[in-house]
From Swiss-Prot:
It is found in: Cytoplasm. PANTHER family: DNA-DIRECTED RNA POLYMERASES I, II, AND III SUBUNIT RPABC1. It comes from Methanosarcina barkeri (strain Fusaro / DSM 804). DNA-dependent RNA polymerase (RNAP) catalyzes the transcription of DNA into RNA using the four ribonucleoside triphosphates as substrates. It catalyses: RNA(n) + a ribonucleoside 5'-triphosphate = RNA(n+1) + diphosphate. This is DNA-directed RNA polymerase subunit Rpo5. Keywords: Cytoplasm, DNA-directed RNA polymerase, Nucleotidyltransferase, Transcription, Transferase. It is an enzyme of class 2 (transferase). GO terms for cellular component: cytoplasm; DNA-directed RNA polymerase complex. Its main location: cytoplasm. Its EC number is 2.7.7.6. SUPFAM superfamilies: RPB5-like RNA polymerase subunit.
Length: 78
């Protein structure tokens, strides 16, 4: 039996754990602290699948009809 991957579904946008350097750049660009980002629970199925842990920041890349590609950021919490 093959394992089902949430990330392969057409309705699920790309999720990835942000490298520290890229995260610092984004936080600086928006003049915010990591704790001010929107949150996502560590028990979220996609967080489990990508191996995110509490304190990581997940970058979500969505396809947008108006913007082309749009990036969103979420802080992983308990």
């Amino acid at each position: 039996m093959t394992k089902f991957s949430l990330l392969d579904h057409e309705s699920v946008p790309k999720h990835e754990i942000m490298p520290e350097g890229e995260l610092k750049s984004v936080l600086s660009k928006y003049s915010i602290e990591k704790e001010q980002l929107p949150k996502i629970k560590v028990h979220d199925p996609v967080c489990k699948e990508i191996g995110a842990v509490v304190g990581d920041v997940v970058k979500i890349t969505r396809i947008s009809q108006t913007a082309g590609e749009a990036e969103y950021y979420r802080l992983v919490i308990e």
